[in-house]
Amino acid sequence: MDTSTSFPSLFLPTLCTILISYIIIKYVLIWNRSSMAAFNLPPSPPKLPIIGNIHHVFSKNVNQTLWKLSKKYGPVMLIDTGAKSFLVVSSSQMAMEVLKTHQEILSTRPSNEGTKRLSYNFSDITFSPHGDHWRDMRKVFVNEFLGPKRAGWFNQVLRMEIKDVINNLSSNPLNTSINLNEMLLSLVYRVVCKFAFGKSYREEPFNGVTLKEMLDESMVVLAGSSADMFPTFGWILDKLYGWNDRLEKCFGNLDGFFEMIINEHLQSASETSEDEKDFVHSLVELSLKDPQFTKDYIKALLLNVLLGAIDTTFTTIVWAMSEIVKNTQVMQKLQTEIRSCIGRKEEVDATDLTNMAYLKMVIKETLRLHPPAPLLFPRECPSHCKIGGYDVFPGTCVVMNGWGIARDPNVWKEIPNEFYPERFENFNIDFLGNHCEMIPFGAGRRSCPGMKSATSTIEFTLVNLLYWFDWEVPSGMNNQDLDMEEDGFLVIQKKSPLFLIPIKHI
């Protein structure tokens, strides 16, 4: 073929398409400016053609970048990323409008291919639209996973696994540091999996992939694809970089893993007593009674358990231990309280924690400075509304920067960027969704249903670690030298692992 004649014939239609698209976009933008003039739009950083504000937020720590931008553009700020508009809320007052005043219309999640696929077509409680299905599924989740009849079994599992950790630490060679990240992640995996599934699957690879690898990969694909931001041509980038194949592989691994768990429970159902039945047994029984409660519904709820309960809990415990050890006066004060409340016992009991006021301050301060999910999962605006006096249009995603809100110097007047638990002595703010000054678990209808069980796990773990052991940094380090750099996107973890030396106290 003569390429000198074929190339123009291929290039000319492409050039015409680009020119026509440019003309259309130009006139649409002009029309938009004139039609939007009557509305009070939120302030926004300068945008570039096509990509919008992506260049402003393309950073390692998006939560910190958005917080810095909010200081210039205000607590209600519009960020455009291609075809998607995000309203970023960075103050407790504006968060109150979103979570309480407008919760009726701002209770639906935005959708993308990743969330749709992994949630079994929005069958779960995290990503499903607000409505009857979401209410029914949340009710099942709360009753069967978090209800009073499950509390005793949860406490028993937690106590057994903590005891195992304490025994392992006690046999640790003298003056030898341990990786608390690995230890605590393993602990939380075992607690969650044994409570929900009846046994820990962490060390049992499925199709050559570990559960941790599956969950890490799911967090990547849930973050979205190029097509989510650029519907017109983003699919080309997804194709080039294999995003769709990656999504299908991730889904296939998770689906196969859940199928295995369900089948194991179906086979053992007749041999399992009522006292021994776990979360999956309850869901399987429900599906046998109600054909509309499908196997996909079970799998969607299992994904919610794994994604919602493991990384966030483990991350918070690591941050808490990091801050406690870094601030030696906090560690001394907290250990004094813990050891005086418990006395000399062979085993710590959950009732021992009742009067530990300083412990609760330390956990509050940890969740304030280090919310596990710094950017709360977005809500989509289905109809026009006003937030902070600004017009917000349908399709806009509303994102609350919980990380920034909890560091607002207008609210947190005493050293807002420092770890100072004593601030809560005369500042009656909780993190359970009643106050918007700190919202690590969200607030309103879409708040995290497992916040109380997560808090119980964090409290009981910290108390045991600090009751049985004193903690030192490795030789050659000072406590104040602990690296507190953040890393991650959906869940913010401590970038460098926490290595500490446990010294048996009792």
UniProtKB/Swiss-Prot annotation:
Q: Which reaction does it catalyse?
A: (+)-costunolide + reduced [NADPH--hemoprotein reductase] + O2 = parthenolide + oxidized [NADPH--hemoprotein reductase] + H2O + H(+)
Q: What is its main location?
A: membrane
A GO cellular component term found in this entry reads: membrane
Q: In which pathway does it act?
A: Secondary metabolite biosynthesis; terpenoid biosynthesis
Q: Which residues are glycosylated?
A: 32, 63, 121, 168, 175
Q: Which GO terms describe its molecular function?
A: heme binding; iron ion binding; parthenolide synthase activity
Pfam families hit by this protein: p450
Q: How does it sit in the membrane?
A: Multi-pass membrane protein
Question: What Gene3D superfamilies has UniProt attached to this entry?
Answer: Cytochrome P450 (1.10.630.10)
* Enzyme Commission code: 1.14.14.-
The UniProt transmembrane annotation reads: 10-30, 301-321
Q: From the Swiss-Prot or TrEMBL record, state where the protein is found.
A: Membrane
**Which keywords does UniProt give here?**
Glycoprotein, Heme, Iron, Membrane, Metal-binding, Monooxygenase, Oxidoreductase, Transmembrane, Transmembrane helix
Which InterPro entries does the record cross-reference, listed alphabetically?
Answer: Cyt_P450, Cyt_P450_CS, Cyt_P450_E_grp-I, Cyt_P450_sf
Q: Which family does it belong to?
A: Belongs to the cytochrome P450 family.
Protein name according to UniProt: Parthenolide synthase
